[in-house]
Amino acid sequence: MHRYRSHTCGELRASDVGSDVRLSGWLHNRRDLGGILFIDLRDHYGITQLVARPGTPAYEALDKVSKESTVRVDGKVVSRGTENVNPDLPTGEIEVEVSEVELLGAAAPLPFTINAEDGVNEERRLEYRFLDLRRERMHRNILLRTAVISAIRHKMTALGFNEMATPILSATSPEGARDFVVPSRLHPGKFYALPQAPQQFKQLLMISGFDRYFQIAPCFRDEDARADRSPGEFYQLDVEMSFVEQEDVFQPIEKLMTELFEEFGGGRHVTSPFPRIPFREAMLKYGSDKPDLRAQLELVDITDIFEGSEFKAFAGKHVRALPVPDVSGQTRKFFDGLGDYAVEQGAKGLAWVRVGEDGSLTGPIAKFLTEENVAELTKRLSLAPGHAVFFGAGEFDEVSKIMGAVRVEAAKRSGNFEENVFRFCWIVDFPMYEKDEDTGKIDFSHNPFSMPQGGLEALETQDPLDILGWQYDIVCNGVELSSGAIRNHEPEIMLKAFEIAGYDRDTVEEQFAGMLRAFRFGAPPHGGIAPGVDRIVMLLADEPNIRETIAFPLNGNAQDLMMGAPTELDETRLRELHLSVRKPQPK
């Protein structure tokens, strides 16, 4: 028999009754019932119940073993009997009567209970992550991540993509987030940077003659944490394709996402094809360029209805309406609750009216609406008895953000929100440029390296604020999974695009010398995308925080509490790297 086990803890069934077996695992739980000791033994594969009778060496040994210790046990498989079957366990028809016990690794007193899923401080969990990962939910999440990455590789290869590795040590990048830098011992005073993304390298692969590239790429950004973003390190499915237009990128990614989310989504349906929504339309209808399409309500721009209005709350402002059908059964609490929610999002309040059986409008602002206002609102919003309308007014970006959040919350509270579904969309036609309202300066609004729609002619003849870029986002249930673009591969178009944003030619030539040099040697049209693996797994696992899907994440302050990183270097190491440390003075 094997030194540690003949079977796993998830393997034994009724057909194994009478067999002599050896198991190894962690002592998950213990119960003493009428002097008989019942032990749940857990390993990677499952749980098997052990039984130790009083007066036996096995009982004496197991009675002294602390929870989460590792043990090896020998014993005989016996039936639990029909009345004692545990239907929640695959091994629930049997138990193992233990005859011999070997303690493999004793566990110290636990900092928290392993088999209690909630109520444990996250900082403590991260400090003892090796214990936290023993919990069923966390173990399941990490295995899901493994399976998803394996499936991505298989599916991308089947779609004709080739997996290639790009450098981890590279040059610092002048755009994007802050770099993590690595000092060079051999080149005093010089530094490498960990890649924020393999962006330039994957484009260089296309220029090198490769056609369809992908990589499960580690990316490093010195930025703050969010619920959907891990500080420090994250992984993305990095993709680039040659001789493509926008739809050519969409097709394989849409197929991949549909198959991936159907396979691992736990029965939640994927709606396809994914709609293409222009950026401006998304902001007007949903108040966000990351719309949650499970919310079956849409905003309506009614600014024109109130142009020149004497109602000061709306006059001269951007006004958005949110019609909500069939709220006849809702009390004042529903309306006040949404008003409170809007205030939490930054609004001063939330105006509303409701439609009576006779079609008349009642509510806090009804008296300020003229007959013409009411007639136009009824027509524009297709109002009917039992409907309600919520209003937001202000600057475009402000009212979009607030009413976008209210749209989703109102859908949830009014029964207009789809559950158990993944609703994807593509956001397209992003503006190439935006104007800083304070300085009047024109700058890039999103990706400076995307190809402008209309090419050089558009840059030379159109108002910069009217130019759109070949840029796109893929969004699922209100979570942005990735941005992407058709790249600007022509040096003269790139230089002109940067000139409009206020960059002189020499600066661009210096900062992007490597890419511009490559572009001048026959670069193909190319484009790509890079969906975040961590965010994909977060959605599939239905977790609210991305750290729940990463084996060893940093905390919100970019610290590894388990390993004690970041650490200080001693003087010897600093001298080797030609560094000295200058800490900020306390304020």
Curated annotation (Swiss-Prot):
UniProt: ATP binding residues: R221, D222, E223, E480, G532, V533, D534, R535
GO CC entries: cytoplasm
Pfam families membership: GAD, tRNA-synt_2, tRNA_anti-codon
BP GO annotations: aspartyl-tRNA aminoacylation
Amino-acid positions noted as binding L-aspartate in the UniProt annotation, renumbered to this chain: E175, R221, H446, R487
Superkingdom of source: Bacteria
Xref: InterPro entries: Aa-tRNA-synt_II, aa-tRNA-synth_II, aa-tRNA-synth_II/BPL/LPL, Asp-tRNA-ligase_1, Asp-tRNA-ligase_1_N, Asp/Asn-tRNA-synth_IIb, AspRS_core, GAD-like_sf
Keyword line: Aminoacyl-tRNA synthetase, ATP-binding, Cytoplasm, Ligase, Nucleotide-binding, Protein biosynthesis
Annotated segments matching region Aspartate: 199-202
Localisation: Cytoplasm
Oligomeric and partner information: Homodimer.
Function: Catalyzes the attachment of L-aspartate to tRNA(Asp) in a two-step reaction: L-aspartate is first activated by ATP to form Asp-AMP and then transferred to the acceptor end of tRNA(Asp).
PANTHER family associated with the record: ASPARTATE--TRNA LIGASE, MITOCHONDRIAL, ASPARTYL/LYSYL-TRNA SYNTHETASE
Designated name of the protein: Aspartate--tRNA ligase
Originating organism: Streptomyces avermitilis (strain ATCC 31267 / DSM 46492 / JCM 5070 / NBRC 14893 / NCIMB 12804 / NRRL 8165 / MA-4680)
Taxonomic lineage of the native organism: Bacteria, Bacillati, Actinomycetota, Actinomycetes, Kitasatosporales
Gene name tied to this protein: aspS
